[in-house]
């Protein structure tokens, strides 16, 4: 079942489908072991890489979880809190008590205005999907520089696999500082040429759809990268 890196058509499975025998292989995201079989837990394409079997989703929607690192966009500022788009079906709220600034009542827009991007963590998600965010933590801040780019949620595991090898290549080739958030947003800070290259690459990956094509598309774009990094 080694079909992941040679461009072959991957097998499409649905939840509950038997992917194949375990046979000493490990299980990654989108699958589980049941008896001696590997079973799919989501709709997607089967991928095997270095002895690990995963199911890459055909499409994913970000669903917030406590502890997630997210980049939110301010869409409303009230007297004592902000509402933010976090690229999912539910907005997040940031109370001024969980902001990193000393905020006077009614002065929220003096610190984070409409369309500002904030690096936050999800503090709590309740049973009706109310999402509370916090900026109390190391590195959490308003992103006053750089650009926020979209990354399909289904590609995040691919970027973080094997010690974030692909993400490190993106950093080196673009010559940008990067922060990859769990909600499908990537902050990039560097020269305009590096940010533009990243934007074009991510659009090409989004058009291809499949996570297994990410590395091949990156290889194709590498020659035009602003920096050749360690390649």
Place the predicted regions along the sequence by residue.
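Single-stranded RNA-binding regions, centering on S1/OB-family and related RNA-binding modules
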Residues: 1-231
